[in-house]
Curated annotation (Swiss-Prot):
Pfam family, one: PEX11
Family: Belongs to the peroxin-11 family.
Gene: PEX11-4
Cellular compartments annotated: Peroxisome membrane
Keyword Methyltransferase in annotation: no
Alphabetical UniProt keywords: Membrane, Peroxisome, Peroxisome biogenesis, Transmembrane, Transmembrane helix
InterPro entries membership: PEX11
Transmembrane stretches, start-end: 82-102, 197-217
Parts of the chain on the Lumenal side: 103-196
Lineage, top ranks: Eukaryota, Viridiplantae, Streptophyta, Embryophyta, Tracheophyta
Identification of the protein by name: Peroxisomal membrane protein 11-4
Length: 222
């Protein structure tokens, strides 16, 4: 691939809201790990890293303005083959992004600061519920794909090879989505039920980067 092709794809990637979000999310969690690593040895550097993390986190909330409409639109449509799973996944996503607006506004001083913790909890709860059901749906589809792939491989034929390739590409994308959702679920649990493992800076940092980089892969132009 030429440098021009890569630059063209980067421009397309960053033109998407999800593309910008994944880039800033990378900044957010790299700076979290940098803060943790420098906290004891270089407090000044750690403070700068913390400021970068905070700024990136607030910027991502601003980028997500109106994103709850995606979940609302999903609820408006027929639930399809997944039925209740799809309804609960979209409802959780809608709650997450809707209350995230209030978390953002309270943290930047537009609303009372005491609201931030409460709104963050509600948002994280909705987020976690949504991720559980999105993960379940992706795992169901991966299982179906594996069964279909085995069937096609038994039958053989050139046309079947194309279908198998398509199934495998879909599986990779769903595995990436599952990895991102599991990582984000860990971050959500840290907000809902703080504990030493989920709330450790390394756990949060690695989880955030796994989610961000899986998103890079899924959204990168083909």
């Amino acid at each position: 691939m030429s440098a021009g092709d890569t630059l063209d794809k980067l421009v397309v990637f960053l033109a998407k809201r999800d593309g910008i979000d994944k880039l800033v999310k990378t900044f957010q969690y790299v700076s979290k790990l940098a803060h943790w690593a420098a906290e004891s040895s270089s407090p000044g550097l750690a403070g700068r890293a913390k400021n970068w993390e905070t700024s990136a986190g607030l910027s991502r909330k601003a980028f997500r303005t109106g994103r709850f409409l995606t979940g609302l639109n999903g609820l408006r449509r027929a639930p399809g083959e997944f039925g209740a799973l799809a309804v609960l996944a979209n409802a959780g996503e809608m709650v997450y992004f809707f209350f995230d607006h209030f978390t953002w506004l309270s943290r930047v001083g537009v609303l009372d600061a005491w609201l931030a913790r409460r709104m963050s909890f509600i948002s994280a709860f909705g987020e976690s519920v949504g991720y559980v059901f999105f993960i379940a749906m992706d795992l169901i589809m991966i299982r179906r794909g594996l069964r279909q792939e085995r069937k096609l491989l038994r039958e053989g034929g050139k046309d079947k090879d194309k279908e198998v390739k398509k199934i495998r590409m879909d599986r990779v994308m769903r595995l990436m989505a599952t990895a991102a959702n599991v990582a984000d679920l860990v971050i959500g649990i840290a907000d809902i039920e703080p504990n030493p493992f989920c709330n450790h800076a390394v756990t949060l940092g690695i989880s955030g980067l796994v989610s961000a980089w899986a998103g890079w892969y899924r959204n990168w132009p083909s």
